[in-house]
Amino acid sequence: MIRFALIVASTLGFVLTAALGNLMTPLLRAFRVRQEENEPPTMGGLCLMVGTLAAVGVGWTAACVAQPELLGTESLLTTRLLIALFGVLCFGAVGLADDLVRLRHRSPLGLRRPVRLALEAASGTLVLALLGLNHCLPDGLALPGVGYCTLGPLAPVVWLAILVALAESARTADGMDGTVCGCAFIAMLGLMTAMTLLGWFPLGVLPAALAGALMAFLLWNFYPAKLRPGAVGCQFLAGALGCVPLSVGWPGLTLPLALPYWLEGGMVALQIIVWKASGGRRQLFGTAPLHRWLEKRGFDPVNIFYIFGVLAMLGLALTLQAARAS
């Protein structure tokens, strides 16, 4: 019956997001500010948020009706799911605030960096606090060839740094049609499979619902895009990739699952570090992030989408290898 609940969640996520995308695309187009007429509207991530939330609710309800023991307190499945959902929505809310600032104040950069980082850190801290209060916060992570490494009191600091860094990295990736959502779709499939291998199959309802929603969103987001996720969508997806593995005690899965985003954000970080260290006289790359670098090398949007898909598949393979070895 859990398998049926996952099918329900993914199907409902697809249907709801497809319907919402059809309704919201003309509405969001009317709110565009400082954009060219041929540019697609942003903030499409709202479709993902609403569709995923509803699909998870229905899917988890179906699972609990079929197997009431899922509501037991031994493994705190419902608690872990709710905390993960809360974290995902918190990061999505930060992205929504970022997008609204761009619209209302006509600021192409959105929220100021210190404000955005503070909001992301606050969201991550809330998630960690809730996990800690419910005795669900992991104190280490499993490393291939090394085993489980305990971080002790440094664990919350490391988890918070990962959550914030991932949110910033995903934010930089929203510039090429389909790349953010395509990579996230593959990551959700990998996360759902890894959770099954690790014994958290019931909680796969969240990545299943999000995978269905992403499949529908790609109907509008694939090149040539009619709708983009915006900061709200990117932060929402970053929250899912960070909070779901953390809530089931496997935060290390975030590292390979989000491989394309780490490459995007890491490239920007290195560019900034080298530029500041040289006093603004030197750049490590011709341009950053990775999708802009590929674009400058002559790759068209479809080929860039495929390259990011290959990177996401590599991350998926590394994730499954780590899950099997644990």
Tell where the protein language model's regions lie, with residue ranges.
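Short, charged low-complexity intrinsically disordered segments located at boundaries
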Residues: Q271, A323-R324
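Short, strongly hydrophobic alpha-helical membrane anchors
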Residues: M1-I2, S326
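Membrane-proximal soluble regions of multi-pass membrane proteins
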Residues: A30-V33, P260-I307
